[in-house]
Amino acid sequence: KEYAMGDRMRPVPFEELIDRIFSEYRNHGTIFGIHKEDFYKTNPKHSITVFGQKCAVPLGPAAGPHTQLAQNIVSAYMVGGRFMELKTVQIMDHLEIAKPCIDARDEGHNVEWSTEYTLEKAYDEYLKAYFVLHLIQAAFTGKVEEPDFIFNMSVGYNLEGIKQPKMQTYIDSMIDANKSPLFKQYKTSLKNIIEEGNLLEGTDLEGNEKALKALENRISANICPSVTISTMHGCPPKEIEAICSYMLTEKKLNTFVKLNPTLLGYDKVRSILDETGFDHVGLKRESFEHDLQYSDAIAMLHRLVELAKKQNLGFGVKLTNTLGNINDGIVLPGEEKYMSGRALLPISTTVASLLSEEFDGKLPVSYSGGCTVFSVKDLFDTGIRPITMATDMLKPGGYARMAQMAQILDKESLTWDKKDIDAKAVKALSEKAKTAEYSQKAFRGDNQAKVDEELPMFDCYISPCMQACPIHQNIPDYVGLVGDGHYAEALSVIYEGNALPNITCNICDHQCQFHCARMDYE
C-alpha cells in the first residue's frame, strides 16, 4: 500500500520561527536539523555581484521545494546559499497538486509548477525569511554589514495573469515592502525580540549583541530588485518578450528570463540523452516544435538586451528550465513530467555555449541544470553566476551538499572577479559534460535503497540497510554511537541482535552495502 505524500504545509509564525531557530541552536547546536559543523562561513575576500547586488556566495536554491517555506530558505542560507530564487508564483494560487509530485531517484522528475501557497501566504513566507536572514547574518558575524544575500522573485506564467490585482499586489510588495502591513509588523516584532536581550544567551554567539542593535531599521523595504520570468512550455515568443518588457519598463526590475532545453531541437537533445545513457527518457518531437525556436529566441534576446540598456537595468537568461518528457506513470501522476538534475548538465551547458558565443560572453547567465559537486567549479570558472540547484539537495546529505560546493569554490576557484563569460570555456565544459563519468547514467546505476515492504502509518522510518540485512542488524544505532565515540554502547547494540557476531561476519554477503542510503553521496 502506498501512503500519500504529506500535502499540508503549515506556516510557522514569525516570533515562533525565531524562537525555534535560536532555541534549537542553543540546546543542540543545530538549526532545522543542520549541525553547526555543516554551517558555511563566508570568506570576506570573496563575493560576486548580480545586477549590482552583492552576493557573498554564488550559490543558492533554485525556485522549487527549497524556497517555498521560510525554514527552507533559512536552511539554505546556513549551508552557503546566498542567491535565493524564490518559488514561482502565479495568478492561479489555489491549485490542487497531485502527490507525489517529485521523483528524484536519480535525475529529477516533477509534475508541480508554482508555489502551493496562495499569493498572500507565499509573500508572508518570503518576508519572514528575509527578516530572519538579516538577523542570522548579524548574530553569526557580529558585524553591522549590508546583506550578503539576494532575494530574486520568480514570476509566471502569462502577462494577463501578472497584471491581475493579486499579482500586482505581490510584485509591488516585493519591490517595496512598505506597501504591506506585515513589513511594519515584523519590524516591530524583531525590535521587541532584540530588546529583550536574551536571544543569544547560552550560545557561542554571546558578545555579538551590538550587531543586533536597531537591526530592524537597517532592513531595506526593497526585497527583490530582480525577477526571473518563468513561462509555460510552448509559450509564444511574443508573450515571453511582452512579459520581460513589462518587467523592465513598468516594474523597473532587473530581469532574467528562463529558457527551455528545447532550444537545442529534438534531434540534439535526443542524441545527448542517448549518449549519456538516459535513453529511457521519452521525448515528443511536437513538444520541441511548439516551443520557442532558437532563431526566435536570439532575435528576442537581442531586443531585450537593448531595451534593458535604455532602462539602465540588467537583463540575462536563466538556463535552463526543466525538460518535458513522457510520463511512464510508475511514480508520478499525469501524462507528462519535467526532468531536472544531472541529466540536464550537458544539455543546459550546450544552450549556454550557444548563447555565450552569440553574445560574446556579455549576456549574464543564471544557471540551473544539474550542477553537482563535480561540475560546480567548472561552471563558475566559465563566468556563469549565480548557480542554483534543487535536485541535488533532494539526495542524501540534503542541504549540506551545497556547503561542500561552496567550500570548493572558496578554496579552489581563482575566477571570483570574472565579469564576462568565457564562451570557449563554456563550450569546453559542454563537451566534457557529455563524456564525463559523472554525467553518465551508469555513474549512479540502478541500485535502489527504497524499502519494498509496507510501512506503518507511524514510526514509518526504517533504514534500507537494516531491512536488507538477513538478521536485521541495527546498523544506524551502531554507526551513530561510534560517531559519538560511545564504543562500548555500540558493541552492545551488535550483541543485542547478534549473539554470534564472529560467525555471522564470516558468512555475511554484505547486503547492507547494496541497500545503503549513502549510495547517493559522492
Predicted regions and their residues:
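Conserved, mostly hydrophobic/aromatic
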Residues: 61, 257, 317, 355, ...
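Glycine/Thr-rich beta-alpha phosphate-binding loop at enzyme active sites
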Residues: 28-43, 261-361, 396-414
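Glycine-rich beta-to-alpha transition loops that act as phosphate-gripper elements at the mouths
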Residues: 63-66, 323, 363-376
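C-terminal helical cap(s) of enzyme catalytic domains, especially alpha/beta-barrels
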Residues: 94-113, 393-421
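N-terminal capping/small domains of soluble enzymes
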Residues: 2-250
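Ferredoxin-type iron-sulfur electron-transfer modules and their immediate structural context
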Residues: 400, 404-405, 410-522
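Catalytic cores of alpha/beta
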Residues: 70-76, 242-245, 357, 370-389
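Glycine-rich phosphate-binding active-site loops on the catalytic face of alpha/beta enzymes
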Residues: 80-93, 259-261, 377-405
